[in-house]
UniProtKB/Swiss-Prot annotation:
Coiled coil: none annotated. GO terms for molecular function: cyclin-dependent protein serine/threonine kinase regulator activity; protein kinase binding. This is Protein CNPPD1. PANTHER family: PROTEIN CNPPD1 (PTHR15615:SF108), PTHR15615. The keyword DNA damage does not apply. It comes from the Eukaryota. One of its GO terms (cellular component) is nucleus. InterPro entries: Cyclin_PHO80-like. The lineage of its organism: Eukaryota, Metazoa, Chordata, Craniata, Vertebrata. The gene is Cnppd1. It comes from Rattus norvegicus (Rat).
Length: 408
């Protein structure tokens, strides 16, 4: 029974013609899509975008890496040689990544081998061993040594010697863990994305996604975001402060302009003495209560004597005005002793200077009745009033004398 008969189902619908597209690994489709998208293999399967040869960015990375690994100047590896060998030998991306794993092992286990081999021979023999490990004998994709020699321009005996020396340097340990393959794939993707972005001057969305998966780029991006956040906070604080300062300045200017346009109020009168005490002392009229003259005098003298005793040290003494011309009448009434005196310089009863001198004509109304001049608010007040300096001390003495004369 042939293979086609074994693969037929009950209905006989399976065809062997599509067997080359059959995938045995579950993640093969995802891996192929990832390689095509991130390693610049393209999506057009009908043209030259298949996975049977290396893409141009991958070829550049391979040349750079192998030149550093094998620094021998003999047969130095070139990109044209890489493209020719990969096209003639149908090198897949997985074989190329496995060859990079082998070269990395040689750098750590046997660096002397890399010093004696050329970079072109190292590329050819590493790709041949990786392809033989992936595609075992009996597969259609296998390539014999003569074909590899023809693709690389090397004789078969020389190629066999290179293969034996390579396997001896590797200690025949060709097994590779799949995690190592994916680590190399991730590293290769980041190198390709960074190199192509720098060459173009801008990065595609796929390149940015690849770079952000790397820990170094994540750390750099995180620090950049932190600095941007700090700068934004500082700018926000500066903006708010400037706005607040501008508002405060406008308020101060508006208030100052309002105060300058309004009329300035007159300064308050800082007087500690009531106005009625600073006015000229006018002789009071004779009280009508004749039965108790002393009580009337005590009531009229009690308040001035209290305020005078408190405010007399605080108020400066008023200078008396010049004496007017002598009055025509020979008699004057003293407000301290309530008696008529002639024109003596001092009062005989209280021994105070006599300043009760009238300066105008005598009004017959209050002089004929023996009364003192009217009050300031009286409608018949004299046109000129002579200010008088009354001593509160003398008033107190007069009150005591009156209480002695008129007891009770």
């Amino acid at each position: 029974m042939d293979l086609a008969g074994l693969l037929l189902d009950e209905e006989g619908t399976f065809s062997l013609s599509g067997f080359q597209d059959f995938t045995f690994l579950p993640g093969h489709q995802k891996l192929s899509a990832r390689i095509r998208r991130r390693l610049y293999y393209g999506w057009d399967l009908e043209t030259d975008c298949s996975l049977e040869e290396l893409s141009s960015p991958v070829a550049d990375i391979t040349v750079e890496l192998l030149q550093k690994a094998a620094p021998s100047p003999i047969r130095r590896l070139q990109k044209k040689y890489v493209a020719h060998v990969s096209r003639e030998a149908c090198i897949s991306p997985c074989a190329m990544m496995l060859a990079l794993v082998y070269i990395e092992r040689l750098r750590h286990r046997n660096p002397d081998y890399l010093q004696h081999v050329s970079s072109s021979d190292l590329f050819l023999i590493s790709m041949m061993v990786a392809s033989k490990y992936l595609y075992d004998e009996g597969e259609e994709e296998e390539v014999f040594n003569d074909e590899w020699g023809a693709a690389g321009g090397v004789a078969v005996p020389t190629l066999n010697a290179l293969e034996r020396s390579f396997l001896s340097a590797m200690d025949w340990r060709l097994y590779t863990d799949p995690r190592e393959i994916f680590e190399v794939l991730s590293w290769l993707e980041s190198c390709v994305a960074e190199q192509q972005g720098r060459r173009r001057g801008w990065y595609t969305y796929t390149d940015l996604c690849v770079l952000l998966e790397q820990p170094m780029w994540q750390l750099s991006l995180g620090s950049l975001c932190q600095r941007l956040v700090k700068l934004s906070c500082l700018l926000a604080v500066a903006y708010v402060s400037s706005v607040a300062l501008a508002v405060a300045s406008m308020a101060v200017i508006h208030q100052s302009l309002g105060l300058s346009s309004s009329p300035s109020p007159s300064p308050p009168e800082l007087t500690l003495v009531p106005k009625n005490l600073l006015q000229p002392c006018i002789p009071a009229p004779v009280p009508q209560c004749l039965t108790n003259v002393s009580s009337c005098l005590e009531d009229s003298v009690e308040l001035p004597s209290l305020w005078g005793s408190l405010l007399d040290p605080l108020t400066p003494p008023l200078m008396p005005p010049p004496d007017p011309p002598a009055p025509p009448t020979p008699f004057h009434k003293c407000p301290f002793c309530q008696k008529f005196q002639r024109n003596p310089p001092n009062c005989r009863a209280c021994h105070q200077p006599n300043r009760t001198v009238s300066i105008g004509p005598i009004h017959p109304f209050y002089h004929t009745h023996g009364l003192a001049p009217p009050w300031l608010w009286s409608p018949v007040a004299p046109p000129f009033l002579q200010p008088q300096q009354c001593s509160l001390f003398s008033v107190m003495k007069l009150a005591r004398l009156t209480s002695v004369i008129f007891p009770g």
